[in-house]
Amino acid sequence: INNDLKNIKDQHKYKDSLSHRKLGVHYSEIINNLLNKNNIKKENISAIGMHGQTVSHTKKDNQTISIQIGCPKTLSEKTNIRVVSDFRQDDIENGGEGAPLAPLFHDYVFNKLGAKRAIVNIGGISNISFLTSNNNSLYGFDSGPGNTLIDSWVKDKYNLDYDISGNIAKSHNCIDQLLKNFMMDKYFHAKFPKSTSTEYFSREWLSENLKLLKHNYNDGDVLSTLTNLTAFSIIQGIADNYKNCDEIYVCGGGAFNKTIITEMELAARKRFSKQIILDTTNSLGV
């Protein structure tokens, strides 16, 4: 399925693809196995919420275009459970970005009365949720690249799927001028609401930025810089929009990259005038 999704992105073939149905079947297998494993009766499930797999998320003529695959009808038929889907389009039609979806879930699961808390999900793209637990309005946005640039660089230069625990990046040095150049991108300075995608922060984006400085950098140092970019842009997004934040918790695949976490801690010390609790959501039991 991962290869199918990549081919869809590369070839720009979306809902007419067989993968639209295949993903629905895949989701149904996961759900059916989960219910069976935990002895949960289907009649006790009110509905399945499915937002699908995003294959394109762009802006054109100041209009957000967000396309997901994963057939809700197939999922419903294979599980015999009602499915609620296409969450993003209603938000887009009402002036929103259609992403990220995570804040509602994060607020429900991680809200703690009085806590000044932000939740960071590091997937391909990083998104931040600012919770309502301190009389705030719930909001969130994409802070920038998460794993996408790191993973693509590691794949191209080391033939690995990802930098395990951030070990390669840890053994190299961040290139300060290159990081500054990355951070000059207009997205990092745009006000929320805002969202982005791996179509924007892509191999092409990285290649163009490397060309600007006309320097033959060490592969490991570029990787270290990309890791710092993820960490720094997250902390900048929090510090610029939630100065009273006391707690930051990280989830998603990037939470396993110890170097991202370490660089986030270092960046937080520089941006905040107080001690910030920074940990993964594992410490909250999730």
What are these regions, as identified by a protein language model?
Residues 1-17, 137-138:
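Short glycine-rich, Thr/Ser-proximal phosphate-binding strand/loop in the N-terminal lobe
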Residues 11-72:
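Short beta-strand-loop/turn "lid" adjacent to the catalytic site in phosphate-handling enzymes
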Residues 41-44, 113-115, 242-246:
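Short helix-loop-beta connector
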Residues 46-47, 118, 221, 247:
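Structural motif
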Residues 55, 246-267:
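Glycine-rich phosphate-binding loops at beta-strand->alpha-helix junctions
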Residues 59-66, 77, 81-161:
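Phosphate-binding/catalytic loop of phosphoryl-transfer enzymes
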Residues 139-231, 235:
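Conserved ATP-utilizing enzyme core subdomain
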Residues 268-286:
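Conserved phosphate-binding/catalytic loops in two-lobed NTP-binding clefts
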